[in-house]
């Protein structure tokens, strides 16, 4: 692992396997018992891009109080079970010392994970320590990453899986310039409750079309220099909306990525979208009027160009018809319907052979 990775540093006894309450040692095969739902949860976490590292204190391992051979048999069986089911640990880190030995490797000290911290391997924002003891949470704090305290009743493996993979896809962007003051907030997994106010009634309606047909919630508040014209208001709103959508999508793992829409009323609107990470716009629509309501028709293409710049998407968008109002509305509606397909979560894999979007 040369680049930074999302790593789960997982305790063994009491987290992966049941810790015997009598002597706290898994030193016989008949004492080996997996924690509930640990294997399917770890498999799903691997699919979500997490690497697995086991980090465990084993008091007095290799001494008369805990002979190495007593540890090896159940530990090796556990590892064989995990491997046979597709669960792969990149590393198994073991501290064999007693607490009174005052070693540098015993959790919550950093000795066992020193190589990961100094080698630039850890994605600090997304890596997690998982364990049942306070020392595991202290290790997480010392590593400057998140800690989750495992408890089979209140925070078992099903809950941990949900916590780490079902993240709220929300974002808020505030953009303030000399011309505009804008706040855009989106929630990609909620619908309805849109609150849009840009000072341009027709533009508000078009933004609502994107959110409604896109199947997500949008709040958009804009204070712009409309006493001059609508250029900065529309351009900066598009930039803020594209940025908010990109931030809410996160690493894009599990999304559909692509979308295609072909709505047909009296206008034929076509939209093809790829959340590719690369901005590109192909736009084809002609208008016979300079304005529709309070919206300059020349700003329609500029809106979508600005949006593709910050969303970093490839967008092909066209519409043909006789009524400018309907043409513009069909463009926004088609984009919304296409965006709905592209942002829909369909699994856990990243939809790219390159490993990044």
Swiss-Prot record:
Tell me the domain of life.
Bacteria
* Catalytic activity, reaction form: D-erythro-1-(imidazol-4-yl)glycerol 3-phosphate = 3-(imidazol-4-yl)-2-oxopropyl phosphate + H2O; L-histidinol phosphate + H2O = L-histidinol + phosphate
Which cofactors does this protein require?
Mg(2+); Zn(2+)
> Which terms under GO biological process does the entry name?
L-histidine biosynthetic process
Q: What is its EC number?
A: 3.1.3.15, 4.2.1.19
Residues covered by region (Imidazoleglycerol-phosphate dehydratase): 169-357
Q: What SUPFAM superfamilies does the record point to?
A: HAD-like, Ribosomal protein S5 domain 2-like
Task: Give the primary localization class.
Answer: cytoplasm
**What Gene Ontology cellular component terms go with this record?**
cytoplasm
* Gene Ontology terms for molecular function: histidinol-phosphatase activity; imidazoleglycerol-phosphate dehydratase activity; metal ion binding
> Per UniProt, which keywords does this protein have?
Amino-acid biosynthesis, Cytoplasm, Histidine biosynthesis, Hydrolase, Lyase, Magnesium, Metal-binding, Multifunctional enzyme, Zinc
Protein name according to UniProt? Histidine biosynthesis bifunctional protein HisB
């Amino acid at each position: 692992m040369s680049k930074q990775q999302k790593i789960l540093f997982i305790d063994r006894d009491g987290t992966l396997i049941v810790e015997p309450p009598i002597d706290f040692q898994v030193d016989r095969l008949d004492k080996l018992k997996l924690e509930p739902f640990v294997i399917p949860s770890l498999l799903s976490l691997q699919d979500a891009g997490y690497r697995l590292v086991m980090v465990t204190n084993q008091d007095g391992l290799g001494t008369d109080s805990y002979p190495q051979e007593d540890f090896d048999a159940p530990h090796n069986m556990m590892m064989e079970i995990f491997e046979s089911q597709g669960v792969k640990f990149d590393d198994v880190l073991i501290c064999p010392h007693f607490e009174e030995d005052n070693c540098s490797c015993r959790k919550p000290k950093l000795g066992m994970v020193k190589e990961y911290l100094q080698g630039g391997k850890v994605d600090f924002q997304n890596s997690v320590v998982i364990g049942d003891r306070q020392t595991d949470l202290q290790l997480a704090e010392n590593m400057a990453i998140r800690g989750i305290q495992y408890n089979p009743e209140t925070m078992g493996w099903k809950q941990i899986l949900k916590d780490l993979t079902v993240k709220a896809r929300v974002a808020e962007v505030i953009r303030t310039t000399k011309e505009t003051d804008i706040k855009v907030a989106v929630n990609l997994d909620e619908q309805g409750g849109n609150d849009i106010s840009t000072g341009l009634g027709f533009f508000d309606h078009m933004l609502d079309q994107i959110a409604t047909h896109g199947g997500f919630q949008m709040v958009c508040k804009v204070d712009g220099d409309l006493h001059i014209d609508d250029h900065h208001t529309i351009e900066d709103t598009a930039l803020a909306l594209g940025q908010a959508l990109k931030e809410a999508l996160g690493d894009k793992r599990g999304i559909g990525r692509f979308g295609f829409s072909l709505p047909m009323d009296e206008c034929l609107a076509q939209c093809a979208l790829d959340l590719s990470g690369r901005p590109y716009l192909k736009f084809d629509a002609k208008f016979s009027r300079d304005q529709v309501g309070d919206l300059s028709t020349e700003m329609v293409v500029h809106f979508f160009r600005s949006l593709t710049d910050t969303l970093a998407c490839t967008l092909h968008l066209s519409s043909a018809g006789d009524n400018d109002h309907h043409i513009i509305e069909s463009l926004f509606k088609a984009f919304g319907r296409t965006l709905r397909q592209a942002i829909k979560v369909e699994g856990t894999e990243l939809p790219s052979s390159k490993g990044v979007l």
